Swiss-Prot record:
The record marks S362 as: Required for activity. The lineage of its organism: Bacteria, Pseudomonadati, Campylobacterota, Epsilonproteobacteria, Campylobacterales. This is ATP synthase subunit alpha. Keywords: ATP synthesis, ATP-binding, Cell inner membrane, Cell membrane, CF(1), Hydrogen ion transport, Ion transport, Membrane, Nucleotide-binding, Translocase, Transport. Its EC number is 7.1.2.2. ATP binds at G169, D170, R171, Q172, T173, G174, K175, T176.
Length: 501
């Protein structure tokens, strides 16, 4: 078979025209040194700050330090097998994590990967971990309550949806318990909860997850865990991953609550990373931008305006203090960023007052607007009464004889302190709180021994539910106490006292 010359040339031309050259240019660099979860890389000239890279062993990394001749990259993994001379590839993208309904009920790591052995998460959407906080015009002032189910908080330091309320105290004062109680209390309220564990022991996180499962709270909760054994880079990323997941629900006109447990360990992880990256240390060896580290995180919690769907993201950051010192660097930073703080005290905890909330130092700067009218009515003077009681209590230690009015005030104060005690993992509905605080502030408990206050509390709820169910129903629907309802309530309390105490 003979080919004509022009046929051959036309075939060659056709092949050349249809030749599809798929050339992908990859920019790679070489590791100069690697230690403590940080790699120094030479050769990535065009890399961006915060850009993702891939190492030879498959681990991902994030570029944080851009220097003249090298790039400081934190390794988002174990970093096993990485050595000098290994190649590093630019991925030309920023870090994204999965968001959406598929994550609810799951335990994930700081990159959004499942670590609960329940299979793959099929997320429909991924979002950038570093997002800019919403501006002023996109927001609305906090006006809806977020009930924690804890009497002392809902009455004295109320939290609103979209608020940032700090929980601060020494170790072993019940900070995590307050946060977990708040999550349990959101059952049936349509609030998606995110619990971010930073630098915690795995056993502690497992305990929290177990507690949430026992109370059916994992049905609406996502747990993000960067444990004590995880690299500092993952501990640094975990809160940003959590808030990104929370923002998805907020932006879709839903309500979300996020707990950061705790930001002291987060700051320590960031300090560790910064020092290894040779960034200049400042006060307490923290880098200069440690304030920005937390402010950009906490500013992402907000209440959106009606045009954007009126969704909200409430943040409960936790800070651990040393010997009650709230004037240390990180505590003062976070106090100045948040809209109030709940201060837990070791002395109160040890004396059996639990939750160990110091009413004098705890404050909610915006939550008052979110409190329902009924709670406002019954707890209006409670903070002042408790403050006067504490003052009088200190004075009574030295004075042997007190006048009648002071003695009555002391006795009322003792009953109110007893009334605000609450066992862990047993949040109370608002209507029950209103009934109980009404009984205390209106003097119905003055003739009951302090040791029997718990008995009164345990009995009054089932009694009203059985004999006067309309009281709870009216508080729920009206969200306020009118004179008729107050009369009914007083009558029911007196009836219970006469028959059961």
């Amino acid at each position: 078979m003979k080919f004509k010359a022009d046929e051959i040339s036309s075939i060659i031309k056709e092949r050349i025209e249809n030749f599809d050259l798929n050339l992908e240019i990859e920019e790679t660099g070489k590791i100069i040194s690697v230690a403590d979860g940080v790699a120094k890389v030479y050769g990535l000239k065009n890399i961006m700050a915060g850009e993702m890279v891939e190492f030879e062993n498959g681990d991902k990394g994030m570029a944080l330090n851009l220097e003249e001749s090298s790039v400081g990259i934190v390794i988002l993994g174990k970093g096993e097998g990485l050595k000098e001379g290994a190649s590093v590839k630019r991925l030309k993208k920023l870090l994204k994590v999965p968001v959406g309904e598929a994550l609810i009920g799951r335990v994930v790591n700081a990159l959004g990967e499942p670590i609960d052995a329940k299979g793959v998460i099929n997320a429909n959407e991924y979002r950038f971990v570093e997002e800019k906080a919403k501006g002023i015009m996109a927001r609305k002032s906090v006006h809806e309550p977020l009930h924690t189910g804890i009497k002392a908080i809902d009455a004295l330091v109320p939290i609103g949806r979209g608020q940032r309320e700090l929980i601060i105290g020494d170790r072993q004062t019940g900070k995590t318990t307050v946060a977990v109680d708040t999550i349990i209390s959101q059952r049936g309220q349509g609030v998606i909860c995110i619990y971010v564990a930073i630098g915690q022991k795995q056993s502690t996180v497992a305990q929290v997850v177990k507690r949430l499962e026992e109370h059916g709270a994992m049905e609406y909760t996502i747990v993000v865990n960067a444990g004590a054994s995880d690299p500092a880079a993952l501990q640094y990323l975990a809160p940003y991953t959590g808030v990104t997941m929370g923002e998805f629900f907020r932006d879709n006109a839903k309500h979300a609550l996020i707990v950061y447990d705790d930001l002291s360990k987060h700051a320590v992880a960031y300090r560790e990373m910064s020092l290894i990256l040779r960034r200049p240390p400042g006060r307490e060896a923290y880098p200069g931008d440690v304030f920005y580290l937390h402010s950009r995180l906490l500013e992402r919690a907000s209440k959106l305006n009606d045009e954007l769907g009126a969704g909200s993201l409430t943040a409960l950051p936790i800070i651990e203090t040393q010997a009650g010192d709230v004037s240390a660097y990180i505590p003062t930073n976070v106090i100045s960023i948040t809209d109030g703080q709940i201060f837990l005290e070791t002395d109160l905890f040890n004396s059996g007052i639990r939750p160990a909330i110091n009413v004098g130092l705890s404050v909610s700067r915006v939550g008052g607007a979110a409190q329902i009218k009924a709670t406002k009515q019954v707890s209006g003077t409670l903070r002042l009464d408790l403050a006067q009681y504490r003052e009088l209590q200190a004075f009574a230690q030295f004075a042997s004889d007190l006048d009648e009015a002071s003695r009555k005030q002391l006795e009322r104060g003792q009953r109110m302190v007893e009334l605000l005690k609450q066992p862990p993992y047993s949040p109370l509905s608002v209507e029950k709180q209103v009934v109980l605080i009404f009984a205390g502030t209106k003097g119905f408990l003055d003739d009951i021994a302090v040791s029997r206050i718990k008995e009164f509390e345990d009995g009054i709820y089932p009694f009203i539910e059985a004999k006067h169910p309309d009281i709870f129903e009216q508080i729920r629907s009206k969200k306020a106490l009118d004179s008729d309802l107050e009369e009914k309530l007083a009558k029911a309390i007196n009836e219970f006292k006469a028959n059961h105490l």
